Every structure is written in structure tokens, then in C-alpha cells.
Amino acid sequence: MNSEVIKKGVERAPHRSLLRATGIIKDEADFQKPFVAIANSFAEIVPGHAHLNEFVKEIKEAVREAGGVPFEFNTLALCDGIAMNHPGMRYSLPSRELVADSVETMVQGHRFDGLICIPNCDKIVPGMLMAAVRLNIPTIFVSGGPMKAGRAKDGRPIDLISVFEGIGAFRAGKIDAGDLLELEQAACPGYGSCAGMFTANSMNCLCEALGLALPGNGTILAVDPRRSELKKWAGRQIVELIKRDLRPRDIVTPEAIDNAFALDVAMGGSTNTILHLLAVAQEAGINYPLKRVNLISARTPTLCKISPASSLHIEDVDRAGGVSAVLGELSRKPGLLNLDCLTVTGETLGETVGQVQSLDPRVIRGVEEPLSPVGGLKVLFGSLAPEGAVVKTAAVVPQMMRHQGPAVVFNSEAEASAAILGGRIKHGDVVVIRFEGPKGGPGFMEMLGPTAALVGMGLGESVALVTDGRFSGGTRGACIGHVCPEAASGGPIALIKDGDLISYDLEAGTLELLVPQEELAARKAAFTPPLRQGLTGWLARYVQMVAPASIGAVLRPACGRPPGEQDYE
């Protein structure tokens, strides 16, 4: 056991003395048991994490009962919703790296034998996933659970995105201040990750497909008593994984990442999932090509449309059978999933989900009667995005699947939001927001403010938005993000001028800037990236280390196994 280095032998008497002082060691027999790290992420200001201080207790009890010794520690958690649309959002994606590094530091410093990760919200899940494959000790994930959808006064289900879009509706005179207040008060009824197929719930679902979480992890509500049984199972199962020496890199293989993307596109997950899965692959030493997402999306049908793409929420998916039902339906068509991949259940994916069926085809369609024959995410390439851009096609209306329009260019999210809410954008425009990439922002801010404003102002079905920033999982509409190379690196997006024609075709996977090459070359020669003044602290270091979005915006040098050790095509 790893932990023997801190508890075995005469030389470790001081270590044992300190361990006794914690109160965790109950008797001498505890020194013979595996030490299990429990990486919690409790934070009172984050509704998806505010309950985790109580949540963890049953997990620790189950570890004890199974023959392990649990040691809980905490890492940071940032609420993307509260950080949205102000400078705090610059810290959102960088916080992913801090989560990964803090978990690595605690586990390596104390030589734990196994790890239980308790994340829930947007950057905490991928941060812990990155740490898990980096550390490569037996690990299991159990999330805090999704939030129940709210209810408007007319009974319709609502969520946080309803409030963001309500701001635009209020500015457009469609609702009054009282209506907006009612949305605000009803949209988020309690603990849990926000109720739609946004980034947090997308990532918690993908943990099941990757094989690192038990069935039910992604969809059982935070307030559902069944989550108690899931926690106890996780506490028992980690001890079994330690006995079997089943490690994350035995589970998170290139084929397992394919499975995660298949689930992702079948459920119309957040575009952020592409960023995060690429980062997890990098940490596992896998060079996973961005273009492969299109291959998977082209062969994988869309079986669900969840908020923001419909009025359905994660609780509806759970009622219909959860992630296991989606994977079970996909497994009925050969070639969509790699069913031999291992999971933390101790079984293969096929053994875990092969007999599970949808309990409600209105929520989870069968593979032979899908909502769409192709998946809900797409990677675009072209003269505006030579290294790629991403879009959630599942949330795009049919008339915006192809579009050509004049660019209206902004050098920050704040400028764009003000223009949209000020009525300066018209039908047919292509809003361009640049210098918001990983390096240029810095921090790769989410553009939920402007995208929600477009919907609220009645422009969501006639205006496109293109950015080197990224989007909330709650974004809907023709919103194309992660444009690479980003403006701060001199990518073509930096050269766009107001009125330039931009064309895209989401089915063909193209994104083009319709400006002659000679003109672009002249603009490139004259281009000087703007200097961001006053950048200090962590973000100043982040700018120097962050890699492009096309490989997950990880920090260089890459951690884990050396990059290129395992190429995947």
C-alpha cells in the first residue's frame, strides 16, 4: 500500500504520532488498513456544494465499514453562475487547474491508497478528473447531485437560464420587474448543480460513461434519498477497487473517452465538455484529436433534448432511467460504444448498462427512433477557425444551421452585452466577441450574458455569435465558441472588421471569413495584440502557461505521462 511509507516501521513513529493526533485513527488495527482520501469541495456560496459538508458523512461511514480509513480534505469550488458577467469569471477555468493541483498535492503529500472525489459544479468535476488520471491510484467519483427544476407561477419548469434570459426579456419590455423577480425567486429551489444539461450535469453524466462513477451519479437529484445509497455504495466500492488495484488509467482509455463523447453528443451536452475531456485525455497521456469528435457525432444519434434545448430537465432523464438508459439504448446499435471498457462497478460498461432501457421514450428515445440521426455537438474548421471551433447543434434552430451575415465586432464580453441590451444588434448579424480566449481574456470567460441577452431580446433565432471565448452549458442558439487560434495569438478572428461577411454551415462543419487573402495578409502584417494592463497574481502566471483550447486549455508543460506517448486517431 502507498500509505505504508507514512505508517510502517520504526522510522515512521513520528508520522504515526501525528496521525493519532487527528482522532481518525481509532486503534492499532487502523494502521493495517488502506488510507482513503476523500476530496470534498464544500463551499457555502455555491448551491451545488453548500450541502457537501453533511453529504460526505455517509461516505466516510461506508469506507469505515468496508475496512478503510477515511481522511477528508477540501478543495476550492467556484460557482460559475455567481462569477458570470464580471471580472470574476476570468478565474473560472483557471480554477480547474487549481482543483487538480490541490488534489494532487494532498494525495501525493500524504501517500493515500485510494481516492473518493466529491465534486458537483462546472470546473470542480473536470479538475478532479484531471487529478485522478494524473495520480492514478484507485479512484471513484460521487457527485453532490443535480438541483430540482424550479416552477414558474404558471407551472412551467424553469432554471437559472430562465433568469438570465429574463433580463433580456425585461430590457425588451416583454416582462416587467415583478415577473423578473418571480423568476429570480423560483428558478433555483435548493441544493444541487443547476437543473439543465449544462456543464456541471454534463460532466457528472460523463463520469458514468468514462467509467469512474457508479450508475446514477449524473442524474439522481441532490435531495433524492437514493443518493444516500449511491454514496454508501461508493464508500464500499473504493475499498474493493484498492484490493483489485483497479486504477483510473485502466479505465480512462482512448476508447472510454470515445464512450464519453458518444454519451455527450447523444444527450446534447455542453460545449465545455469538449474542452474538459480533451484536458483529461492530455493528463492521461492521450493525444485525442479534436476532429475525432465529429466522427463520433456523425455516427451517434441524438436521444435526448434537455434544457436549454427543451423544457425537460435532469430529473426527467433520471425518471426515464438515467445515464444507464441512454447508454443502454446506444449499446443496441453496434459500433456506437466500446462495451468492453472497464468501470468502477468492477464490470465492463456492457455488463453495467446492456440490459437497461428507457422508461420514457418522450425523454430518452430509442436508438432506432432518435430525435436526430447525428449527435448534438460539432467541431467546425475553416478560414476563421483553422484549428477548430465548437457549437452545440442540439440547441440551434433549423433556420440557423446555415447562415451568412455581417460581422459586428467587440473586443470584450462587456462591450457586446451592452450593445445587445442597448438594441444595437439587428436580425441577420453575426456578433463577434474576441480577446476572450484562454490567453486573451485571460481565463476563457463564458459568454452566457450576451447569449442569454440575444434570446431575451428576441434575436436568438436570427443572430449568430462567434467568439474565441466559451459558453455556459446553458447557452442556446447559433453560438460558436473556442475559435482557434484565439485573437491574442493572432488568429484570424483578430483580423475581422465590422461588416466583414462571415459564413458557416453546421452540417458541413465549416466556418469561413469571406475576406480576400491579400486583404487578410495586409491586416495580419499591421496587427499588434493589445496589451492587458495591471495583470497580477495567479492570472499573470496562467497567461504564460495556458495551452490552446484545441488541446483542452491545459497548462504547459503537460502533467501526467509525457504528451505524445499515446496518439489516438
Curated annotation (Swiss-Prot):
One cellular component (GO) term of this entry: cytosol
Pathway(s) it belongs to: Amino-acid biosynthesis; L-isoleucine biosynthesis; L-isoleucine from 2-oxobutanoate: step 3/4; Amino-acid biosynthesis; L-valine biosynthesis; L-valine from pyruvate: step 3/4
Names of the cofactor(s): [2Fe-2S] cluster; Mg(2+)
Keyword entries, A-Z: 2Fe-2S, Amino-acid biosynthesis, Branched-chain amino acid biosynthesis, Iron, Iron-sulfur, Lyase, Magnesium, Metal-binding
Cofactor note: Binds 1 [2Fe-2S] cluster per subunit. This cluster acts as a Lewis acid cofactor.
Gene Ontology molecular function: 2 iron, 2 sulfur cluster binding; dihydroxy-acid dehydratase activity; magnesium ion binding
Catalytic activity: (2R)-2,3-dihydroxy-3-methylbutanoate = 3-methyl-2-oxobutanoate + H2O; (2R,3R)-2,3-dihydroxy-3-methylpentanoate = (S)-3-methyl-2-oxopentanoate + H2O
One Pfam assignment: ILV_EDD_C
Residues that, per the record, bind Mg(2+): D80, D122, K123, E446
EC number of the protein: 4.2.1.9
Ligand binding ([2Fe-2S] cluster): C121, C194
List of catalytic residues: S472 (proton acceptor)
Single Gene Ontology BP annotation: isoleucine biosynthetic process
Top-rank taxon: Bacteria
Sequence positions bearing N6-carboxylysine: K123
Keyword Kinase attached: no
InterPro entries: Dihydro-acid_dehy_C, DihydroxyA_deHydtase, DiOHA_6PGluconate_deHydtase_CS, ILV_EDD_C, ILV_EDD_N, IlvD/EDD_N
Function description: Functions in the biosynthesis of branched-chain amino acids. Catalyzes the dehydration of (2R,3R)-2,3-dihydroxy-3-methylpentanoate (2,3-dihydroxy-3-methylvalerate) into 2-oxo-3-methylpentanoate (2-oxo-3-methylvalerate) and of (2R)-2,3-dihydroxy-3-methylbutanoate (2,3-dihydroxyisovalerate) into 2-oxo-3-methylbutanoate (2-oxoisovalerate), the penultimate precursor to L-isoleucine and L-valine, respectively.
Subunit structure: Homodimer.
Protein family according to the UniProt entry: Belongs to the IlvD/Edd family.
Protein name: Dihydroxy-acid dehydratase
Lineage: Bacteria, Bacillati, Bacillota, Clostridia, Thermoanaerobacterales
